């Protein structure tokens, strides 16, 4: 194929609803047309560290991510080559040995907290979206997710939020809002915004045909 896939970056604070927005956009297209890449899958390999040391890693800092590999994979997908995406184990705080094959599609969504903060990623994107949600809503969502899905204790989630998540949000994530083409308030519940974005993507796909 000569045309390049459309790359869409979706970011926002932890618990903002960016995953909900991403999944809702994906739901509006045929499965063979769209794929989602989670930045979380590209946390660095920490096999050389003990589990006690891994727990202390600042996972909301740019240094926690293997951005070089993510950029490489996005470029390969842009040239219609499949990639082997890492699989991350949130309970062990490390990559799994197996990987997931991701086939190139006409529309590629990359979703994560630092997607717009990282210039190397940002420069590849055709559409840049920031999901903006109140801090109190985000912390409640984070509590529910990390306790239910990631095996964390209430105390550990609260401590991590106060000492790491919130400071990193103010330092890296919130400032990246200025790079967004579209800012979505109310997260994944903003149907009007999602309708507009989906309509714009469909127009871009038609123009590239």
Swiss-Prot record:
UniProt-listed GO biological process terms: CTP salvage; UMP salvage
Binding sites annotated in the UniProt record for ATP: 12-19
Annotated catalysed reactions: uridine + ATP = UMP + ADP + H(+); cytidine + ATP = CMP + ADP + H(+)
Enzyme class at the top of the EC tree: transferase
Organism of origin: Clostridium tetani (strain Massachusetts / E88)
Molecular functions (GO terms): ATP binding; cytidine kinase activity; uridine kinase activity
Keyword field: ATP-binding, Cytoplasm, Kinase, Nucleotide-binding, Transferase
This enzyme's EC code(s): 2.7.1.48
SUPFAM superfamilies for the chain: P-loop containing nucleoside triphosphate hydrolases
Subcellular location: Cytoplasm
PANTHER family named among the record's database cross-references: URIDINE KINASE
Family the entry assigns: Belongs to the uridine kinase family.
Keyword ATP-binding (UniProt): yes
UniProt KW Oxidoreductase keyword: no
Pathway: Pyrimidine metabolism; CTP biosynthesis via salvage pathway; CTP from cytidine: step 1/3; Pyrimidine metabolism; UMP biosynthesis via salvage pathway; UMP from uridine: step 1/1
Name of the featured protein: Uridine kinase
Lineage: Bacteria, Bacillati, Bacillota, Clostridia, Eubacteriales
One GO term describing the cellular component: cytoplasm
């Amino acid at each position: 194929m000569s045309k390049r896939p459309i790359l869409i970056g979706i970011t926002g604070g932890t618990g903002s609803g960016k995953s909900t927005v991403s999944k809702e956009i994906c739901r509006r297209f045929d499965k063979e047309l769209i794929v989602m890449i989670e930045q979380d899958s590209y946390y660095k390999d920490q096999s050389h560290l003990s589990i006690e040391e891994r727990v202390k890693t600042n996972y909301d800092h740019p240094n926690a991510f293997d951005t070089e590999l993510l950029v490489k994979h996005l470029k390969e997908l842009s040239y219609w080559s499949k990639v082997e995406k890492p699989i991350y184990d949130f309970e062990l705080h490390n990559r799994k040995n197996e990987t997931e094959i991701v086939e190139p599609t006409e529309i590629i969504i990359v979703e994560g907290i630092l997607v717009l903060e990282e210039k190397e990623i940002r420069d590849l994107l055709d559409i840049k979206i920031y999901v903006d949600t109140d801090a109190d809503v985000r912390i409640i969502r984070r509590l529910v997710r990390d306790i239910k899905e990631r095996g964390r204790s209430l105390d550990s989630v609260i401590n991590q939020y106060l000492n790491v998540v919130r400071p990193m949000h103010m330092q890296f994530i919130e400032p990246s809002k200025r790079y967004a083409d579209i800012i979505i308030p109310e997260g994944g519940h903003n149907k009007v915004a999602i309708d507009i974005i989906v309509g714009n993507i469909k127009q871009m796909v038609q123009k590239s045909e």
